[in-house]
Amino acid sequence: MKLSYQGIQDKQGYAAAQVALPQYDWAKMAEKTAEKPVWVHFGAGNIFRGFIAGLQQRLLNAGLADFGIVAAETFDYDIIDKIYVPHDSMTLMVSLKADGSTQKEVIASIAKGIKANCADEAQWQQLADVFTAPSLQMASFTITEKGYALRNMKGELMPVVVSDMENGPKQAHHAMAVVAAMLYARYQAGAMPIAMVSMDNCSHNGEKLRASVMEIVAAWVKNGLVPADFEAYVNDEARVSFPWSMIDKITPRPAEIIEKQLMDAGFEDMQPVITSRNTYIAPFVNAEVPQYLVVEDRFPNGRPALDKAGVYLCDRKTVNDTERMKVTTCLNPLHTALAVYGCLLGYTSIAAEMKDAELVKLVKTIGYKEGLPVVTDPGIISPKAFIDEVVGQRLPNPFIPDTPQRIATDTSQKVGIRFGETIKSYMTSDTLNPADLTAIPLALAGWIRYLIGVDDNGAPMNVSPDPMLATLQAALAGVTLGQPDSVDGKLEGILGNASIFGVSLYTAGLADKVTADVKELLAGP
């Protein structure tokens, strides 16, 4: 069997392989989309194919829409040539259930893929045609947080951005300049309204997108490349809105075991490709079942019926509260605790850690006992139900090949949000005392113990990349497993650093507890 418009006409074969098919005609949908595009999406990778495109498929299947999504790729053009074109932009979606079973569906809601490449005149014009259509309601984004960045780690504008600012809309290469160029095309065609919806997994994502686009536009105005009135258009939220959103769904790289299952079921050409930009992508996407998308409901030109596809539409405060619930209480703190202890104990799978009763007790205590009393409740999702799903289904899912080593990356940049916010809430509470916390200090002690780079058996261990790693390891030089007192006098600078934890752990009254835990962890296995 082949994954394509022609291939899915083999309804018997697909039924035998237990793969659900779209309940609409892809060719008709693609034709309708070309006539009147409504939704364009930047970032043609797995989270888009495995989550966002599925939302539109629900609407198409239910007869609530007759158009698809146009996918635009600004970074890796091979995705369009090697994955989209051969398969008529279709994706074989494999949902990975916690009980080990899978659910398969052909997602056909992407009308076409376009390379957002100004050097490819035909493709560039196709994208401009989408942006100049009065019917266009939204442009959404999953380009990763790095996709919005105009500056390098030193705070200097990247060379590509400097060049884009000097050359204007016709020579736009950076993703943010491409977006600005397309907005300029829309402005020239009548300054029609549109919503620019970042769906990347980062706080205040709409603000990040807006700030970067506005910086490019302002440079073009300053350099006399576009009229000042264009800047006024992009700056007018009644015409160009930048809603915030919260997204949550784990979509790991294509798994070999899934590829084999699909080949055994009779599918051809399921092999992943590694593109010239090092993207690992396949005709299929595997992902967990739980998924959340919360979007600020600000769409000046109308929007698809996303609320009928399981998307929460709400105000900005609710988006922010949902993000805070996830990041400070219900998911991310549990992830970080499992990450540092998983590395120390030699685990390479988060799911395997969830078979360790002590680690399960640790994350349940962090989530339920210490986190929930101060959780931000967004009102649209129950924080307790969210943790129930995280602990009961998501973390133990053996099909999600997430590693503690990956999650341990950049922990110094994360502990202030993931644990510090809860500590601060305890400090300002009339009824709670940070001194009563036990699991959060133990998680922080685990991170400090992890930084030494020696596992629980005394063997050298790789420490994941972190911008503060050299500084932190220098402070901990000489700390030795089996010698608890070797830590004496070496933790003050770390534990008192409010820029790491969001608060000095001395001020919070937790420094002694963390120190005692570190000493206990250093005593040896």
Q: Over which residues does each language-model region extend?
A:
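Substrate/ligand-engaging "lid" and interaction regions
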Residues: 1-42, 46-525
